[in-house]
């Protein structure tokens, strides 16, 4: 039993075959259906519940913040996904943070943070961490036997969709995404969570792995992510994320 928690990444936005939420979608080319296909091809019997909701953020606080600054946010992981994780799940994957970082930078663009934008970003990273703890606790309460595999964030400031953004916006996106990865997600390895390290994976920064919007992966991008998820599920030992790498400070 595999429950996937995520946003449009889970439904495969940007892929050649995108899935609708909550469907098995066996022919999808996002990382969730590709992961399911690869596991089935290796002989695993697998039932999939893809809980991904496009535009979703981690918690109600980020949903409210985004709506205050005119972002379309259809839901959040804690309220609309966590309660529906399959109770007999053996694997749960979580990919959170991309829409949350974009919400933070949108708020900054709308004047939030005033003269101390760094402090605002850091406060939002802490709020994200509190939400992530709530999400994990709820998932473990629903599916106590599940192996939990999470993906950290790449440095969003370096992705193609922000190539023409202002230096200030890119610096904020870097501070938020690196903060989320290093202070919230990577430390989860101490809680028996497997962390897939997109932050320090050079493939996460190759423009050829992204769709035309520069934010969502294409089939190639989702393919490499699925390969890592499958490796994490099937390996007895998966490498811990890097403590530091050049990608964390790519924007001066």
Model-predicted regions and their roles:
Residues 98-99, 108-109, 136-174:
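Active-site segments of SGNH/GDSL-like serine hydrolases
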Residues 8-12, 53-59, 97-103, 154-159, ...:
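Solvent-exposed loop/turn segments at secondary-structure junctions
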Residues 1, 90-93, 147:
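Structural motif
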Residues 36-44, 131-149, 179-197:
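A structural motif corresponding to the C-terminal end of an alpha-helix
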Residues 13-130:
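Conserved SGNH/GDSL esterase-like catalytic core that processes O-acyl groups on lipids
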Residues 153-252:
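Catalytic His-Asp segment of secreted/periplasmic serine-dependent ester chemistry enzymes
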Residues 4, 30, 34, 80, ...:
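Extracytoplasmic/secreted proteins, especially bacterial periplasmic and envelope-associated proteins
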Residues 5-6, 151:
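Short hydrophobic segments within beta-strands
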């Amino acid at each position: 039993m595999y429950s996937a928690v995520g946003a449009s990444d889970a439904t495969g936005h940007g892929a050649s075959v995108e899935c609708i939420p909550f469907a098995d979608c066996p022919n999808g080319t996002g990382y969730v259906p590709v992961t399911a296909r690869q596991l089935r091809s290796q002989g695993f019997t697998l039932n999939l519940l893809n809980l991904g909701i496009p535009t979703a953020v981690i918690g109600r606080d980020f949903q409210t913040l985004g709506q205050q600054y005119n972002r379309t946010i259809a839901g959040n992981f804690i309220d609309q996904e966590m309660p529906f994780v399959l109770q007999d799940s053996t694997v749960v994957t979580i990919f959170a943070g991309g829409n949350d970082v974009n919400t933070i930078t949108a708020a900054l663009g709308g004047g939030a943070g005033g003269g101390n934008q760094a402090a605002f970003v850091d406060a939002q990273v802490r709020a994200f961490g509190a939400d992530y703890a709530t999400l994990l606790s709820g998932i473990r309460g629903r599916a106590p036997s599940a192996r939990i595999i999470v993906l950290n964030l790449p440095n969003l400031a370096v992705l193609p969709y922000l190539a023409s953004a202002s230096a200030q916006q890119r610096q904020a996106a870097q501070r938020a995404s690196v903060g989320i990865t290093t202070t919230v997600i990577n430390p989860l390895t101490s809680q028996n969570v497997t962390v897939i390290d997109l932050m320090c994976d050079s493939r996460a920064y190759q423009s050829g792995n992204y769709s035309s919007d520069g934010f969502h992966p294409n089939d190639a991008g989702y393919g490499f992510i699925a390969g890592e998820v499958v490796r994490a599920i099937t390996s007895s030992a998966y490498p811990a994320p890097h403590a530091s790498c050049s990608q964390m400070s790519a924007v001066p």
